[in-house]
Every structure is written in structure tokens, then in C-alpha cells.
Design a protein with these regions (language model features):
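Conserved acyl-donor/pantetheine-binding loop and adjacent beta-alpha core of acyl/acetyltransferases
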Residues: 73-105, 164-166
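Conserved catalytic-core motifs of GNAT/GCN5-like acyltransferases
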Residues: 137-140, 152-171
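Glycine-rich acetyl-CoA-binding "A-motif" of GNAT/NAT acetyltransferases
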Residues: 67-70, 146
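A short helix-loop-beta-strand connector motif used in the catalytic cores of GNAT acetyltransferases and
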Residues: 49-61, 76-82, 102
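Conserved GNAT acetyl-CoA-binding A-motif
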Residues: 128-141
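Conserved acetyl-CoA-binding loop-helix of GNAT-fold acetyltransferases
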Residues: 103-110, 114-127, 149, 153
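Short amphipathic alpha-helix that is part of the acyltransferase structural core
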Residues: 1-46, 59-68
Length: 179
């Protein structure tokens, strides 16, 4: 892992002040996939608008020289949430009986990958959360499987799969104990 130059992490609980930076860095992070409907910037904008209106919205952005270079955001999900309803097989009650953090997305500008920036953003985001578990969904094919392997190295484990929308690939659902 290469050590990155200093980054500043900023936490947001209101999308209005971070939306432009989120869209800008998303377009850089997902550039090779933007031609696919699920990854288009407009689709991300619609998702982030919807997610920011849900309970517990928090985003952490990393900045270098004033420019966004990475991001992650999350929400709180409750027992019975559509997130859990779309997960197959049904997750164990120990994960769903209490509110959980759903890490909706994390991304780092290509020039900042393999520098520890993603982990710093991830850890800063989870430090704002009180829920006992954090869950995320990942495309097992992302980065030729490297992204899934990275999450496993961070302590996440597979608990099922989900296809959140018809345009989405089938995703692995992973969980990690946060507290």
C-alpha cells in the first residue's frame, strides 16, 4: 500500500452541502462504468437524493488540496426494511432485530486507491454510528473480485445476496460487527 498525501475528512449529515462534491467524485470513481444505466451519474444522483432523505444519513468525504478524492455514505436500517427483505437467504435475526448501519456506497478516485484512503473514510464513517452491525452490498466482480476481498480483509462476512433494482447486478450482502 502506498501512503497518500494528507487528506482532510469531512462529515456531512445534510446532502445539500455535499451533493456537488459527491457527484463530482462519483463520476471520477465510476468513470469506466458510467455508460451502464445503474452507474450513470443521474442514477447515482437519484439514489443519493433518496438515501439522504432516509433516517441516519451520514456521508464522509476525503479532500486533497480542496478537491474531493473519495466518499462513503450510510443510513440506518430497521428490522423489516426493504434492504433486509431483498436479501436472500433471510439474514439471521441477530443482524436484523436491532437497527443496523447500511453502508450504501464507498468510492475512491483511482489516483488515491491503494493508499489507505478508503479505509480511513470507512472507519471515520463507522465512528459516527451507534448501530451494532454494519452491512454493505458489493458486486463480486468489481475489480476482478478485489473489492469483495478487501471488505473481507476489513472483517466483513457474506450473509446472502440481493438485486436492489432490475438494472443492478446481483450483489453479495456482507455484514460486520461495529460495536
Amino acid at each position: 500500500m502506498t501512503m497518500a498525501p494528507a487528506t482532510e475528512l469531512r462529515t456531512f449529515t445534510n446532502l445539500d452541502t455535499a451533493r456537488g462534491d459527491l457527484l463530482d467524485v462519483y463520476a471520477e470513481v465510476r468513470a469506466p462504468l458510467l455508460h451502464l444505466p445503474n452507474y450513470a451519474v443521474t442514477a447515482f444522483g437519484e439514489r443519493i437524493d433518496r438515501h439522504s432523505a432516509e433516517p441516519g444519513f451520514t456521508a464522509v468525504l476525503a479532500y486533497a488540496a480542496g478537491q474531493p478524492v473519495g466518499y462513503a455514505y450510510s443510513n440506518t436500517i430497521e428490522h423489516g426494511d426493504r434492504y433486509w427483505q431483498r436479501t436472500s437467504p433471510t439474514p439471521a435475526e441477530k443482524y436484523t432485530k436491532h437497527p443496523a448501519t447500511a453502508l450504501k456506497e464507498i468510492g475512491v478516485h483511482p489516483a488515491w486507491r491503494k493508499t489507505g484512503t478508503a479505509r480511513r473514510i470507512h472507519d471515520a464513517l463507522l465512528a459516527t454510528r451507534d448501530e451494532p452491525h454494519v452491512t454493505l452490498m458489493v458486486n463480486r466482480a468489481a475489480g476482478d473480485g478485489k473489492v469483495h476481498a478487501l471488505y473481507k480483509s476489513w472483517g466483513y462476512e457474506d450473509i446472502g445476496q440481493s438485486q436492489p433494482s432490475p438494472a443492478s447486478p446481483v450483489l453479495a450482502v456482507m455484514i460486520h460487527t461495529n460495536r
